[in-house]
């Protein structure tokens, strides 16, 4: 497995994120894409406006391969897991098309593939032993699972 980090030079708008995810998942070697960025909470957590709703223009629902995904963050980085190196150039071309303001594409190890102590504390030993390896590194142990992970099924009809 090959891991790529796509680091755009600006936060991405919801439409750009949606375009990137739909295009990336259309490639046959893309196994998973993890998005990371600044959280957009539902309510203001502190200050004079504490408790009032956050009405951010980029807090939207996007559709990735027909699956609705509530975007609760401003995407600042994407990690792409590939089966092999054959489509790295296609990912680079996609980034050139969608990110005219610039980006950095790095090949390396960004996602963990073995359970950590936090996983054992959060889920328990029996759950960690039976967990789907795709879920490792997909969520923060302090977060509520249903709110932080959205599984997008990989269809058999991928284009090259």
Curated annotation (Swiss-Prot):
The protein, known as: Methyl-coenzyme M reductase operon protein D
Cited InterPro entries: Me_CoM_Rdtase_D
Keyword Secreted: no
Organism per entry: Methanococcus vannielii
Presence of keyword Ubl conjugation: no
Superkingdom of origin: Archaea
Subunit structure, interactors included: MCR is composed of three subunits: alpha, beta, and gamma. The function of proteins C and D is not known.
Disulfide-linked positions: none
A Gene Ontology biological process term: methanogenesis
Keywords associated with the record: Methanogenesis
């Amino acid at each position: 497995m090959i891991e790529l980090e796509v680091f755009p030079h600006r936060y991405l708008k919801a439409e750009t994120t949606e375009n990137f995810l739909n295009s990336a998942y259309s490639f046959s070697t893309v196994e998973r894409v993890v998005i990371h960025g600044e959280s957009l909470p539902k309510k203001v957590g502190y200050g004079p406006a504490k408790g009032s709703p956050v009405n951010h223009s980029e807090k939207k629902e996007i559709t990735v391969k027909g699956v609705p995904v509530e975007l609760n963050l401003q995407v600042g980085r994407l990690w792409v897991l590939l089966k092999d190196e054959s489509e790295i150039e296609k990912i680079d071309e996609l980034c050139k098309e969608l990110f005219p303001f610039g980006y950095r594409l790095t090949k390396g190890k960004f996602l963990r593939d073995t359970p950590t102590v936090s996983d054992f504390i959060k889920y328990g030993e029996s759950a960690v032993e039976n967990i789907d390896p795709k879920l490792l590194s997909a969520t923060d142990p302090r977060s509520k699972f249903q709110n932080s992970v959205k599984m997008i099924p990989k269809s058999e009809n991928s284009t090259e």
